[in-house]
Swiss-Prot record:
Belongs to the metallo-dependent hydrolases superfamily. HutI family. Its cofactor is Zn(2+); Fe(3+). Catalyzes the hydrolytic cleavage of the carbon-nitrogen bond in imidazolone-5-propanoate to yield N-formimidoyl-L-glutamate. It is the third step in the universal histidine degradation pathway. This is Imidazolonepropionase. Pathway: Amino-acid degradation; L-histidine degradation into L-glutamate; N-formimidoyl-L-glutamate from L-histidine: step 3/3. It catalyses: 4-imidazolone-5-propanoate + H2O = N-formimidoyl-L-glutamate. Keywords: Cytoplasm, Histidine metabolism, Hydrolase, Iron, Metal-binding, Zinc. Zn(2+) binds at H70, H72, H240, D315.
Amino acid sequence: MRDTYVLSGARLATMEAEGSYGLVEDGAIAIQGDEILWCGARGALPDTYAACPSTDLNGRLVTPAFIDCHTHIVFGGDRAGEFEMRLEGATYEEVAKAGGGIVSTVTATRAASLDALVTGALPRLDALIAEGVSTVEVKSGYGLDRETELNMLRAARRLAEHRDVTVKTTFLGAHAVPAEYAGRADAYLDEVCLPTLRAAHAEGLVDAVDGFCEGIAFSAAQIAKVFDVAAELGLPVKLHAEQLSHQGGTKLAAERGALSVDHVEYATEADARAMAASGSVAVLLPGAFYTIRETQVPPVAEFRMHGVPMALATDCNPGSSPLTSLLLTLNMGCTLFRLTPEEALAGVTRNAARALGMQDRGRIAPGLRADLAVWDVSRPAELAYRIGFNPLYARVMGGKMEVRT
């Protein structure tokens, strides 16, 4: 068969079945172009593929390629200085008065050119790709003015031109109220955020719409206005909600059929029931939990009880989660949030794809995209168990296999 090859002699974690990794021992995968044609036990490989080129993976583990479904990797500047200040005892208010906090990132991002935003994001993207990532979600939200928000989304789109990766863009104009609109959140939404969303959509820059529903950001009623425009434009929504307190954002997101509700440390059982009914994914972000030394753990037991899918992501951002490792995120999800290793792996594959509304990836099955990761480990749990070690042997992106050097 033309342009078809076979990966064989692998232990496959197909992620097709919950609770067992969907394991296939001594497995094989037939790939044509960017599509998986067949997968299963090597002994059952159809004769159709007998003459195709084959690569023996010698017992290595193959999983779906990783998906980072919540990042802020496009931004200007850094916040290492305020990290030191916080460790020396400075309060949030003191950091802000010294020019730190999100204001410093907004200032640096507004000052950066489009090329500079792309150049700054590439090393962060490269770190993710080096750990088997094939798909990355990238948010705006550090411009908070029309041109910078648009430039952030343009930069995100350009990343896929520089690297072999799929990028999904999210408009996050309702991330914070900029200094020039202090105390006038509604005016900011009406005069800047919503017109910018319309402009970004008209330019083809937006795959989804997000917001930050929190006491320090926007109320549920204000986020509802953003979601109204998203619905008018035919865009799916997601929401940062219940991270620092309970504000009712999860209920709103579920009512609007959100793809995901993210952070959710303060979500309740009622929220879990609402998410289960709407099919929304709970995106857990242990990097931010760790960095800001949070103590309120997401209600994982309630999510399990009600069948809410759970994803994991880096939440890579300069302030609360300067994290560019999904492997470390797996470990954090298990040690901090008590996910099982299987739940963690599902969280960066099957459920991460669901959180982005992508049905063509995140599992190993015929008809799906051939985005795979090949690991020098024998047990899937090792991916979450080991710390500071990258066992990636090769990444298969759209059917093209690149062995890590």
